[in-house]
Amino acid sequence: MTETIATIKEKLASLADPHDARLLTWRQDKRCGVQKAIALWEKRLALARKKQADFNQRFNFERDYWLKGVELVAGVDEVGRGPLAGPVVAAAVILPHDFNIVDVIDSKQVAQHKREQLYEIILDQAVSIGIGSVDAKTIDEINIYEAARQAMTEAINNLAPQPQALLIDAMQVYLDITQQSLIKGDARSNSIGAASIVAKVIRDKMMTDYDKVYPGYDFAQNAGYGTKKHLAGIDKLGVTPIHRRSFQPVHDAIVNKKNC
């Protein structure tokens, strides 16, 4: 009995072996729907292989250390340099050597719902995770660059066990630990990518909580960035304790209020 096209599509959906004997039979099936289904399956397989290869390549920096006997390598990243409000948050993540969640990459390349799923997986599988944050008042006092460094340092210090080497996204920290600063590291290292996801999800949750404390600025949606609704909130309600007064739009709002 000839298989229906729907049945073949269903079987292809769960097929991962390109040498499966059924493929030979299906490729000889002259029905257009079957050939389209096989072409789509081949495309999906090629994309999955590329995704796996890219993921494997993003472990190159970690693997260099592992091969030298350096087992505990932490990826470090921060989020929240650009917003007008809220803290800068950093995460440090040590991944196990057999970690194989290929979707882990720079948090900016991952949709929110997917980030939250990956966050839970990383929490479950990581050897260790450390978090650090620096509030708006301190950002104003020491500048955002130094605040990011301070948050990263705090995150690293909160790791247990402590790392033997660090892979850091575009930063050096003042710690006596072997470290590499990688430009766009969150897209080049799985450990840094994992750290960026953890930091992003945690900071977004913090800003959602702040939205309840300080309504009218749309913090739950803009995460403190200078959107139209956020700027309108500043114009109407003034600045909050979590606003960064050294950042231009906020500083201007304070000056304008004093001059009125």
From Swiss-Prot:
Query: Could you say which EC number(s) this protein's record lists?
Result: 3.1.26.4
- What does the record give as the reaction this protein catalyses? Endonucleolytic cleavage to 5'-phosphomonoester
What biological process terms from GO does the record include? DNA replication, removal of RNA primer; mismatch repair
Q: Name any one GO molecular function.
A: manganese ion binding
Q: Where in the cell is it found?
A: Cytoplasm
Q: Which organism is it from?
A: Leuconostoc citreum (strain KM20)
Q: Which gene encodes it?
A: rnhB
- State the function annotated in the UniProt record: Endonuclease that specifically degrades the RNA of RNA-DNA hybrids.
Q: Where does a divalent metal cation bind?
A: 77-78, 169
Pfam families per record: RNase_HII (PF01351)
Membership in a protein family: Belongs to the RNase HII family.
Gene3D superfamilies per record: Ribonuclease H-like superfamily/Ribonuclease H (3.30.420.10)
| Textual note on the cofactor | Manganese or magnesium. Binds 1 divalent metal ion per monomer in the absence of substrate. May bind a second metal ion after substrate binding.
For this UniProt record, give its keywords in alphabetical order, as a comma-separated list. Cytoplasm, Endonuclease, Hydrolase, Manganese, Metal-binding, Nuclease
Q: What is this protein called?
A: Ribonuclease HII
Required cofactors, per record?
Mn(2+); Mg(2+)
- All copies of the RNase H type-2 domain together span 71-259
* Keyword Iron-sulfur in annotation: no
Q: Do you know which InterPro entries this protein is assigned to?
A: RNase_HII, RNase_HII/HIII, RNase_HII/HIII_dom, RNaseH-like_sf, RNaseH_sf
Q: What cellular component terms from Gene Ontology apply here? A: cytoplasm; ribonuclease H2 complex
State the superkingdom: Bacteria
